[in-house]
Amino acid sequence: MACSKHLVLFLTILLSLAETPDSAPAHRGRGGWTLNSAGYLLGPVLHLSSKANQGRKTDSALEILDLWKAIDGLPYSRSPRMTKRSMGETFVKPRTGDLRIVDKNVPDEEATLNL
């Protein structure tokens, strides 16, 4: 009997501490700074007012919104040359000005991995 009283008391306290919709902070949409899919930092989301007589301000705001949407959809660009380099080519400084010509004294990858 004493165990059930403690259980009821414990559940009452838990329910009183539970977050209710009134005590939860209201979600106000996507505000503030955010990252797009490529990792670029974007400014706050543009909210257009409902006034129809703003003229050029509405047009420029729509242009900015279109630019943000276009930038968000761009793929992340990577240099194809950077992905094709080997470990040796990445960390070895060439003696000539041409990055494609590597010094002959540099060991190949298999020799360095087997050390």
From Swiss-Prot:
Alphabetical list of PROSITE patterns matching this protein: GALANIN
Subcellular location: Secreted
Top-rank taxon: Eukaryota
The keyword Ribosomal protein is assigned to this record: no
Protein's GO biological process: behavioral response to starvation; neuropeptide signaling pathway; regulation of appetite; response to hormone; response to insulin
Chief place where the protein resides: secreted
GO MF terms held by the record: hormone activity
Keyword annotations from UniProtKB, A to Z: Cleavage on pair of basic residues, Hormone, Neuropeptide, Secreted, Signal
Classification via Pfam families: Galanin
Signal peptide: 1-23
GO cellular component, one term: extracellular region
InterPro entries (alphabetical): Galanin, GALP
UniProt record similarity statement: Belongs to the galanin family.
Protein name, as recorded: Galanin-like peptide
Organism: Rattus norvegicus (Rat)
Gene name of the record: Galp
